[in-house]
């Protein structure tokens, strides 16, 4: 199973990049949700503009699909500068990063997605560039090799990551601004869906937008993807106008339930309930029961279910909670299992 094959995957598909770019907000005034992040960035950007300085380096972290790339582009637009975009895996050698740094103009934004995947050699080049706006380059080889320093124009590095814990301390400490993006509430997602529908010339009422929002797992990227699929359903099975009923029919057909679960989420939870009496069960046994790899369970399926309170990890294995039994209308066994969660 590939995560990007799931309709409710938070990872971007290749074709989605072009569509998302067309509906992406370009200014903080258009940015929906994340009120704390938005307020802080308004202050930091206004202060930097007032001093006519480059904005301090910014680290943005949080789950995929919440708008890290969008925020990086907004920062560049608000500062009135250009943005150069790359990613950690692309910067294989120190020379790759050096080439990008030497092409920056004063105040420009360098956006590095998946910054936690930078190699140690590339990070070493980045440290003096971030701290002193200098680039150390080795010329020659062997005993004749020597280091020269090149001055760089002041610039802003914006790094994005879904796994902030994998950043090295020296790199993390060089970011003056650190922002965490949280999952969106239903109201903000409804606003995002309504805006996306307007920009895409899709007719939708507020109830229809809310029905999509509550099944979008708190993630704008998923919300916009579901909007496109519901639009298809509305155009073929109705008059093209998305109502709550049309959205409900479409999403039920797509097997996305009221909590945003798809067939894989349900299969995992039901296996724990029906085959293991709710747990505790080891991840290897669970993987065998649903014919999935251990990594798929740990990295793709579990995080959302744990965060939403449908399952927990304990020293004895995985267990479902009472929420899972209620969701499927199953009476939990009277064994006091939840009292033993932390034994």
UniProtKB/Swiss-Prot annotation:
GO molecular function term, any single one: ATP binding
Residue positions binding ATP: 23-24, 65, 68-70, 131-133, 174, 184, 221
Compartment list: Cytoplasm
Residues engaged in binding DNA: 294, 313, 318
SMART domains, A to Z: AAA
Domain observations: Has 3 domains, the large (RuvB-L) and small ATPase (RuvB-S) domains and the C-terminal head (RuvB-H) domain. The head domain binds DNA, while the ATPase domains jointly bind ATP, ADP or are empty depending on the state of the subunit in the translocation cycle. During a single DNA translocation step the structure of each domain remains the same, but their relative positions change.
Function text: The RuvA-RuvB-RuvC complex processes Holliday junction (HJ) DNA during genetic recombination and DNA repair, while the RuvA-RuvB complex plays an important role in the rescue of blocked DNA replication forks via replication fork reversal (RFR). RuvA specifically binds to HJ cruciform DNA, conferring on it an open structure. The RuvB hexamer acts as an ATP-dependent pump, pulling dsDNA into and through the RuvAB complex. RuvB forms 2 homohexamers on either side of HJ DNA bound by 1 or 2 RuvA tetramers; 4 subunits per hexamer contact DNA at a time.
Protein name per UniProt: Holliday junction branch migration complex subunit RuvB
UniProt lineage: Bacteria, Pseudomonadati, Pseudomonadota, Gammaproteobacteria, Pseudomonadales
